[in-house]
């Protein structure tokens, strides 16, 4: 694609699961980092994103399957949490991905 427009990563992460994914990731980072400091062991966070064409939807609609796995080390063992869900999204002209299509016009008058 010659006119590839990169996706706004911050907006994309915040759009996944209505913002719940971003909150879960923020929480996981704090928990795993704190546990790694306390135990002096390695903690791991894994984020997996799968993209597939949405069935029966418009031609630019996709489904983003998201999975967040956190492994926080404990003095004896580890604490594992896994969150997974799906979010319908839209591939805009140029390839950027967002929750809503960006080709629509402003519906309401913007007052400055």
Segments from the language model and where they lie:
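Generic secondary-structure boundary/loop-capping signal
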Residues: 10-13, 86-88
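N-terminal, Lys/Arg- and Ser/Thr-rich interaction peptides
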Residues: 1-12
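Phosphate-interacting basic helix/loop segments used at nucleotide- and nucleic-acid interfaces
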Residues: 21, 25-36
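Compositionally biased, non-globular sequence tracts
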Residues: 9, 20, 80-81, 100
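Mixed-charge, glycine-accented linear interaction segment located at domain edges/termini
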Residues: 83-112
């Amino acid at each position: 694609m010659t006119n590839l427009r990169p996706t706004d990563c911050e907006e994309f992460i915040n759009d996944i699961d209505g913002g719940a994914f971003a909150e879960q990731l923020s929480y996981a980072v704090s928990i795993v980092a704190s546990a790694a400091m306390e135990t002096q062991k390695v903690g791991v966070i894994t984020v997996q994103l799968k993209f597939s064409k949405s069935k029966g939807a418009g031609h630019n609609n996709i489904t983003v399957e998201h999975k967040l796995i956190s492994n926080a080390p404990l003095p004896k063992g580890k604490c594992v949490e896994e969150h997974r869900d799906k979010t319908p999204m839209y591939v805009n002209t140029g390839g950027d991905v967002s929750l809503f299509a960006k080709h629509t016009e402003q519906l309401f008058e913007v007052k400055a």
